[in-house]
Every structure is written in C-alpha cells, then in structure tokens.
C-alpha cells in the first residue's frame, strides 16, 4: 500500500501558494466605536496586530504606525459612520483606502473576534478579493450631506403637521375635512389665529382663501370644537416647531444653492427659467434648481418622463455626474440593485430576484417609475403594459432599470432625450405583435390575412 505523500506544514502567517498576492503592503482594520484593530503583514512589526483608540490623536498615531510598517493600501468595513473620520485621516496621509461591504467579508462561523476580523480583512485585501465601494467626489459628498439634512428637516416638519392634525381631531375640530391641506395658506392662517386666542368660528372662517372650494359657513361649522387648554398648548408648540423647521429648510436651500454654483459646469450659463412660485410646497426648493442641474450635468434629465427636478437632484447627489466609474449601463443598473440577482445551482435558476441594497438613487428611480402610471408618454405606455403583464412590483423595478439606463446614456454621452409619444409607442408595439403572429402562423403552415381583405 502506497504511503500518503507528506505535505509541508505551513507556518503561521504563510499564504496559500495557489493564490497570488496583489497587494503585499496591505493592512486590514476592524472599525469600532471606541477601538480600532489593525493588522499589518507578518514581519513588519513584532506585534502585527495592534489596537488604537477612536480619538483624533489615536487615529494620527495609527497612520504613523502604518507608515512605519511600509503599508500602502488599507481596507476597512463600512461600519455605521465610524469609518468616515478614519477614512479622511488615512487618505490625508497618502494611503489608498478601500471601504468594503461587510457582507462581502464574512468568515467562518465561530471565528468572529476583533483580532481575527482585521487579520481576515488584511488577508483578503492582500489577494485582491475585495471590491472597493463607490464613493463620489468631494463636491458630490458635500451636496449629498446638505440634501440628506434637508430631507430630515422636511420629514420633521411633516411630523409636526401630523401632531397638529391629531390635536385638532382630539378637540373635534374637523378642519381637515373641508380643506385639503392644513399646512396651506388657509389652514395655517386659521391655526395661527387659534393659537393667538381666537375662538369665534365666524371670524376664523374669514381667513378662507379664494381658491378653497368650501364655503365660509362650512368652514365655520368644522371649527366648532371642544377647546381644551392642554391640547391648545400642544398645538402651539407643534406650530412653533413647524415654523422653525420651515425656517431651517429655507436656510438649507440657500446653502445648497451656494454649493451648486461652485460645482464644475458642463454647460455655459443659461437664461433663468420661470421663477419659483411663492405658494410652492415646502418640499420644493426656493431657487431655480433645474437650471443649476442642467449646468452641472450638461443635459436636461427632466425631459425624461417621470424624472422631476428633485428626483434628478437626489440621483446626482448619490451617484455624481461622472459615469466612467461604471464601464457599462448594465454595471450601473447592477450597482443600483435594479437587475436580477440570479442564483444558479445544478443548471437551474434557484432565485432571480433583485439584490437588497440600501440606495437612495434606486428608491428615487422606483418612485419615478410609479409616477408614470398616468403619463401620456412612451415610457408611460410601456410601464402600463409591463404592469398588466408582470404586476406592479416587477413592473416598477423593470421601469426603474430602464430609467437608470437612460440616465447613464444621457450623462455619459451627452445625448438628449426625445419622447416619441404614446401613439408612436403603441404603433411600434402593434407592429411587433403582428410580426410575432406572422411568425407563429408560419411555423404552423398558416398565413395571416387582414380582415379587410376577407370582407372585400
């Protein structure tokens, strides 16, 4: 019986000979709230794994130690927001910093410790097995921060409106049943008068705007309620908070406008479009956002049906204006999580749903796709056909995928979008159906004959 061949016993830290080290000067960092665990290649330091605190001085000391260990590239997981300060400091020292998805770095069960985690990251990065996450340029990151803050403020203002509505309902003031929005001109005027101490329903009804359909008598009847001191106190505070958030939203809009004007332009300054109406909803910026976005991107993305100016703003703040980060439009759609994630085993597709990604741009595209349900454009007709065939959820994803590809082509190649209209789309679809029916008939040794020829 032949003896089994003896295998050479690997020493600690020795790599598998079947893998080729692409990044020999790589370090791995396990990011945490209070401590960061850092691993460097074996032999660079008597203690290749060290722990550093999260204070700024500790982060600078970490960067200096990595320099002393001749490290050139660093990898870390995108853990909450703990990695951001560390990323910026390491980048200022000249390191190539890679931020990876934690789902792509999972190790075996039962081997999850901080020390093993940073060593595992360092090993994976050494062999080039990790993909760096997308991080937009600095000016896009600043814009994204402003827009996310504005979104938080709008959400907080909406919460205040809900609190005011709840308080009115508790006092049986049925104002919301006669006007469509209590945060409009009429609603806010009445609320401010109530907070100021006015209880006469006839006088409160005089604040009715001309565009409100309900009569003054109907509004006066809806304002007959059970005035309670504690609920009026809640109403007053909710109104004050709402005014504060509206003020902060306006300040945020000014900051966004200033930053947009400093961003690189791809077009010559254009003549300003129509001014923003004073009665515009609070979600709409108080400056001409469309012209600024056209100047930055070089194209007018709002020509695409479903893409409103704020949708375009959200997409740009998440993906930027440089489409060269994705080689093809398919890669762009895959990054957004808008394409099938096929799981194949044994020659069979086990799962074909989309990947679960947390991406505000993808969410904005899905909302834009759903807004096409009543659009009289070619995209609207296409979406309604997909909805009847696939159902709403799949149709929304499919149309969001199509919108993403259109945005990619327009921003990368500078092409303008021309909507051919619903009639042109229906005509083209009818021709495709006729061609398919003729092919099916030919396969059965039959022939299609128009109904007019039969009757004649």
Short names for language-model regions:
Residues 1-456:
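A detector of single, family-specific signature residues
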């Amino acid at each position: 019986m032949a003896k089994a061949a003896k295998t050479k016993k690997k020493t600690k830290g020795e790599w598998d000979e079947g893998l080729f080290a692409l990044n020999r000067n790589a370090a791995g960092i396990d990011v945490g709230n209070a401590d960061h665990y850092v691993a460097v290649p074996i032999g660079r330091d008597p203690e290749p794994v060290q722990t550093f605190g999260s204070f700024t001085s500790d982060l600078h000391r970490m960067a200096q130690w990595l320099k002393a260990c001749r490290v050139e590239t660093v990898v870390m997981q995108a853990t909450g927001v703990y990695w951001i300060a560390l990323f910026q400091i390491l980048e200022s020292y000249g390191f190539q910093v890679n931020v990876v998805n934690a789902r792509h770095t999972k190790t075996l069960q039962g081997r999850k410790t901080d020390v093993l985690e940073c060593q595992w990251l360092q090993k994976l990065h050494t062999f080039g097995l990790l993909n760096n996450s997308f991080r937009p340029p600095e000016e896009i990151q600043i814009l994204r921060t402003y827009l996310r803050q504005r979104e938080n403020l709008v959400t907080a203002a909406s919460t205040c409106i809900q609190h005011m509505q709840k308080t009115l309902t508790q006092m049986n003031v049925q104002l919301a049943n006669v006007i469509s929005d209590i945060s409009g001109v009429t609603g806010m005027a009445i609320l401010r008068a109530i907070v100021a101490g006015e209880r006469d329903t006839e006088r409160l009804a005089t604040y009715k705007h001309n565009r409100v359909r309900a009569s003054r008598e109907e509004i006066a009847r809806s304002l007959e309620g059970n005035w309670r001191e504690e609920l009026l106190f809640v109403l007053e505070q909710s109104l004050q908070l709402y005014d504060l958030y509206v003020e902060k939203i306006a300040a945020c809009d000014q900051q966004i406008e200033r930053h947009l004007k400093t961003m690189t332009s791809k077009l010559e300054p254009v003549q300003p479009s129509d001014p923003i109406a004073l009665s515009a909803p609070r979600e709409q910026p108080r400056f001409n956002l469309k012209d600024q976005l056209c100047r930055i991107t070089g194209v007018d993305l709002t020509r695409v049906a479903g893409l409103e100016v704020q949708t375009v703003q959200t997409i740009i703040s998440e993906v930027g204006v440089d489409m060269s980060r994705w080689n093809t439009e398919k890669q762009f759609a895959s990054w957004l999580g808008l394409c099938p994630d096929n799981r194949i085993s044994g020659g069979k597709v086990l799962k074909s749903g989309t990947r679960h990604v947390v991406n505000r741009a993808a969410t904005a595209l899905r909302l834009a796709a759903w807004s096409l349900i009543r659009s009289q454009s070619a995209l609207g007709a296409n979406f309604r056909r997909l909805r009847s065939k696939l159902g709403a959820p799949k149709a929304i994803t499919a149309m969001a995928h199509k919108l993403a590809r259109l945005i990619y082509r327009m921003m990368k190649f500078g092409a303008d979008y021309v909507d051919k209209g619903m009639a042109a789309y229906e005509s083209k679809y009818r021709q495709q159906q006729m061609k398919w029916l003729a092919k099916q008939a030919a396969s059965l040794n039959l022939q299609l004959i128009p109904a007019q020829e039969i009757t004649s």
